[in-house]
UniProtKB/Swiss-Prot annotation:
Protein name (Swiss-Prot/TrEMBL): Optineurin
Motif position, LIR: 176-181
Protein function: Plays an important role in the maintenance of the Golgi complex, in membrane trafficking, in exocytosis, through its interaction with myosin VI and Rab8. Links myosin VI to the Golgi complex and plays an important role in Golgi ribbon formation. Negatively regulates the induction of IFNB in response to RNA virus infection. Plays a neuroprotective role in the eye and optic nerve. Probably part of the TNF-alpha signaling pathway that can shift the equilibrium toward induction of cell death.
Zinc finger residue ranges, CCHC NOA-type: 541-571
Key words, A-Z: Autophagy, Coiled coil, Cytoplasm, Cytoplasmic vesicle, Endosome, Golgi apparatus, Metal-binding, Phosphoprotein, Zinc, Zinc-finger
Subcellular location: Cytoplasm, Perinuclear region; Golgi apparatus; Golgi apparatus, trans-Golgi network; Cytoplasmic vesicle, Autophagosome
C-alpha cells in the first residue's frame, strides 16, 4: 500500500485489474513458488502494519485539521465580535458628535441671547462701565472661534465615520465567502507541492499579529509538514520502485551487451586460434601469440565476472520485483476484497486536501481581516484623539459661558425686578380669582352630587313602579284571556241552549198540534212566552263585556282603549 502511487486509483475508488501498480505492463507476474509461506506471512504482516499506521496517521491528521478548523472558526467569531465592538464604538462616536452638535446649537442660542442683552445694556443710559463690555466682546469672539473649530472638527469626524461605514459594509460582504474547490488527485498533489515550496504569504508571519495568530500558523505549518512527510514517503516508495525497474532494465541491457561481447570474443578466439595454427605452421613468433592469448583470457575472465555480477544483480532485482509484485497482488486482492476501505482512504485523502484548501482560504481571509482591523484601530485611535480634543474645547466653552452668565446675573437691572414684581402681583390676582372659581365649582359639584342621589332614589322608585305595572298588566292580560275563553264557552253553551230551546219549542209545537185540545189554556201560553223573553234578556246581558278603569272607574268599550287610559291615568 505504501509503494503504490496515488495516481493508480480511479475517481470511484476501484483499482484497475488489468495492469499492476508497479513495473512495466509487459512483464509477467513472478511465481509464488519461490517464496516460503513464512516469508509471505511476514510480508503480509508488514503490509498490514503499514496500512494500519497509514490509517492512524490519516485519522490523526484529519482530527488535527478539524481541530484547527474549529480554532479558526472561533477566531473568526472573535474577529466578528471585535468588529461589532468597533461598530458600536463608531455609533457611540456618532452619538457624541450629535450631542456636541446640539450643544453647539445651544451655545449659539446663548450667544445670541448674550448679544441681545449686550445690545440692551448698551442702549440703556445706566451702563457706566465700558471695560466689562470689551471683555464680554472678547469672550464672544473667542466663543465664535471655538464654535467654528468645533464645526470643522465635526465635519472631519463625520467624513471619517462615513469612510468607516463604507469599509465595514465592504468587509461585511466578504466575511462569509467560502469557496469549495474540487479537483483531481494529481492537481491536488501539485497544489500541495506549491503550498510546500511557495515562499508566499502563507508561511510568513507578520510582526504586528497577536500571539494566538502566531500559534495557529505554527500549528498549521506543523500539520502541513506531517502531510508532506506522508506524501514524501509515498513518493519515495514509488521512486524506489522506478529505480529498481530502471536498474533491471540497465542490467538486462548490460547482460545483452556482455553476451554480444562474449560472442564476439569467442569468434575472435576462434580466429586467433586459426591464426596461431597458421603461424605455428609458418613458424612465426610464438611469444607474441602467447601474450595475446593471455590477454584475451584475462578479458574473458573479467567479462565472466561482470556477467556473474550482472546475473546476481538481475536475480536480486528480480527477487525485489517478485516481492513488489506479490505485494501489489496482495494489495489488489485486499482492495478487491475491501473496496470500502479504499473508498474511506480516498475520502480521507480528499477531505485532507479539502481541509488544507479551506485552511489556506481561511488564512488569507484572516490576514485580510487583520489588516482591516488594524486600519480600523488606527482610525479609532485618531477618532478618540479628536474626540478628546473636542471634549476639552467643549468644557472650556462651557466654563466661559458659565462665567458670562455669572457676570450677567450680577448685572441684573431694576426694570427686570419691577417687571418680575408686577408679574408676581398679576399671578397672585389670577390665583385668587381662580381660587374663587374653584370654590364656586366645588359648591355646584356638591349640589349636583345631592341631585344625583335624589335621582338614584327616584330611578329606583320608577323601576319598582314599572315592575308593578308590568305585573298588573300581565295579570290583566291573563284575566282578559280567561274572560274571552269564558265568553267563547258561553257562546257555545248559548248556541246549545238555543238549539235545545228550538228543539223544545218544536217538540212543544208538535205536542200542541197533537194535543191541541189539551193545551187550550191561555195562561199557560202566556207563562211560556214570558219565560222565553226573560231568558233572551239574560243572554244579552251576559254577552255585553264590561271594560272599566280600576282607578277612576271610567267604562271603556275595548280593552286596547282601556290599556291606553290606564297608562295615562296611572302615570
Amino acid at each position: 500500500m505504501s509503494h503504490q502511487p496515488l495516481s493508480c486509483l480511479t475517481e470511484k475508488g476501484d483499482s484497475p485489474s488489468e495492469s499492476t501498480g508497479n513495473g512495466p505492463p509487459h512483464l509477467a507476474h513472478p511465481n509464488l513458488d519461490t517464496f516460503t509461506p513464512e516469508e509471505l506471512l511476514q510480508q503480509m504482516k508488514e503490509l498490514l502494519t503499514e496500512n494500519h499506521q497509514l490509517k492512524e496517521a490519516m485519522k490523526l491528521n484529519n482530527q488535527a485539521m478539524k481541530g484547527r478548523f474549529e480554532e479558526l472558526s472561533a477566531w473568526t467569531e472573535k474577529q466578528k465580535e471585535e468588529r461589532q465592538f468597533f461598530e458600536t464604538q463608531s455609533k457611540e462616536a456618532k452619538e457624541r458628535l450629535m450631542a456636541l452638535s446640539h450643544e453647539n446649537e445651544k451655545l449659539k442660542e446663548e450667544l445670541g441671547k448674550l448679544k441681545g442683552k449686550s445690545e440692551r445694556s448698551s442702549e440703556d443710559p445706566t451702563g457706566d462701565s465700558r471695560l466689562p463690555r470689551a471683555e464680554a466682546e472678547q469672550e464672544k469672539d473667542q466663543l465664535r472661534t471655538q464654535v467654528t473649530r468645533l464645526q470643522a472638527e465635526k465635519a472631519d469626524l463625520l467624513g471619517i465615520v462615513s469612510e468607516l461605514q463604507l469599509k465595514l459594509n465592504s468587509s461585511g460582504s466578504s466575511e462569509d465567502s467560502f469557496v469549495e474547490i474540487r479537483m483531481a488527485e494529481g492537481e491536488a498533489e501539485g497544489s500541495v507541492k506549491e503550498i510546500k515550496h511557495s515562499p508566499g504569504p502563507t508561511r510568513t508571519v507578520s510582526i504586528g499579529t497577536s500571539r494566538s495568530a502566531e500559534g495557529a500558523k505554527n500549528y498549521l505549518e506543523h500539520e502541513e509538514l506531517t502531510v508532506s512527510q506522508l506524501l514524501l514517503c509515498l513518493r519515495e516508495g514509488n521512486q524506489k520502485v522506478e529505480r529498481l525497474e530502471i536498474a533491471l532494465k540497465e542490467a538486462k541491457e548490460r547482460v545483452s551487451d556482455f553476451e554480444k561481447k562474449a560472442s564476439n570474443r569467442s569468434e575472435i578466439e576462434t580466429q586467433t586460434e586459426g591464426s596461431t595454427e597458421k603461424e605455428n605452421e609458418e613458424e612465426k613468433g610464438p611469444e607474441t601469440v602467447g601474450s595475446e592469448v593471455e590477454a584475451l583470457n584475462l578479458q574473458v575472465t573479467s567479462l565472466f565476472k561482470e556477467l556473474q555480477e550482472a546475473h546476481t544483480k538481475l536475480s536480486e532485482a528480480e527477487l525485489m520485483k517478485k516481492r513488489l509484485q506479490e505485494k501489489c497482488q496482495a494489495l489488489e486482492r485486499k482492495n478487491s476484497a475491501t473496496p470500502s476501505e479504499l473508498n474511506e482512504k480516498q475520502e480521507l485523502v480528499y477531505t485532507n486536501k479539502k481541509l488544507e484548501l479551506q485552511v489556506e482560504s481561511m488564512l488569507s481571509e484572516i490576514k485580510m481581516e487583520q489588516a482591516k482591523t488594524e486600519d480600523e484601530k488606527s482610525k479609532l485611535a485618531m477618532l478618540q484623539l479628536t474626540h478628546n480634543k473636542l471634549l476639552q474645547e467643549h468644557n472650556h466653552a462651557l466654563k466661559t459661558i458659565e462665567e458670562l452668565t455669572r457676570k450677567e446675573s450680577e448685572k441684573v437691572d431694576r426694570a427686570v425686578l419691577k417687571e418680575l414684581s408686577e408679574k408676581l402681583e398679576l399671578a397672585e390676582k389670577a390665583l385668587a380669582s381662580k381660587q374663587l372659581q374653584m370654590d364656586e365649582m366645588k359648591q355646584t359639584i356638591a349640589k349636583q352630587e345631592e341631585d344625583l342621589e335624589t335621582m338614584t332614589v327616584l330611578r329606583a322608585q320608577m323601576e319598582v313602579y314599572c315592575s308593578d305595572f308590568h305585573a298588573e298588566r300581565a295579570a290583566r292580560e291573563k284575566i282578559h284571556e280567561e274572560k274571552e275563553q269564558l265568553a267563547l264557552q258561553l257562546a257555545v253553551l248559548l248556541k246549545e241552549n238555543d238549539a235545545f230551546e228550538d228543539g223544545g219549542r218544536q217538540s212543544l209545537m208538535e205536542m200542541q198540534s197533537r194535543h191541541g185540545a189539551r193545551t187550550s189554556d191561555p195562561d199557560q201560553q202566556a207563562y211560556l212566552v214570558q219565560r222565553g223573553t226573560e231568558d233572551r234578556d239574560w243572554q244579552q246581558q251576559r254577552n255585553i263585556p264590561i271594560h272599566s278603569c280600576p282607578k277612576c272607574g271610567e267604562v271603556l268599550p275595548d280593552i286596547d282603549t282601556l290599556q291606553i287610559h290606564v297608562m295615562d291615568c296611572i302615570i
